[in-house]
Amino acid sequence: MEEIKLYGVKIDNITRDDAVRCALRATGEACVVFTPNALMLERARKNKELADLLNRASLSLPDGAGVLWAAEKMGTPLLERVAGIDFGAALLERAERLGLRVFLLGGGEGVAERAAEGLRKKHPSLCICGTSWGYFNQSGEENLGVLSHIRSCRPDILFVCMGFPLQERWVMENLQHLTAIRTIACLGGSLDVWAGDIRRAPAWMSRVGLEWLWRMLCQPKRLAQLPKIVSFLWHVPQKEEFRAQNPL
């Protein structure tokens, strides 16, 4: 599979449909899916530990117009944007057809349960085998209890929705306890959308790469992240500079 690197973080050059097929391929070990966006990559640019964490993914999907723009600027264009929530939705459609079991982990109190209710209405044949909230102590007995609950539900697919880098760290630190799961995907705030707590951007805004603007308009506290997005875009090397730094 072709990949590029942004600030030392690998990004797979893949379509959403191919990503779903790849994520569900039976290989004997879990396919771990991360979805780096501009804010995540900006943090990784300043913190090698975060870059190394992102690089442990089996599949790394370009989430956001900023990532596509940066890849284009470097002369390494990507096939398409694969937003985490769109990937998750496509994965759920495939899970419903194949009879796969899904576990939802993350969100505040009741969020995963409401997300499950909403998804069952949309996908009547989908098997959501279990849910758990994301605000638990990620060490000690409470963490072991969550892991035990997940394993007892026997999911084929696990969605972990706690935000970056908490969700990615938790997955990698506990991967040895989740070996029976086929696909583990970190999907940020997807549960809040599926639960109906947060509205997603209109389709036309997503198509033209303005979903980030919608989020900031709906959640003004996100405006504080705007300088980080600008910094990410500013530091992306031009094509000539990138090639000089990465000779064949």
Regions found by a protein language model. Name each.
Residues 1-86:
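N-terminal nucleotide/polyanion-binding subdomain common to many enzyme families
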Residues 30, 100, 179-182:
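A short helix->loop->beta-strand "cap" motif at the edges of active sites that frequently abuts
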Residues 37-41, 162-167, 190-191:
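Short glycine-rich anion-binding loops that position phosphate/pyrophosphate groups of nucleotides
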Residues 66-72, 200-248:
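A transmembrane-helix-recognition feature enriched in membrane-embedded lipid enzymes
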Residues 72-149, 153-154:
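Conserved beta-alpha
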Residues 133-138, 181-218:
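Short, flexible loop segments at boundaries between secondary-structure elements
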Residues 150-164:
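Proline-aspartate-enriched helix->loop->beta-strand connector
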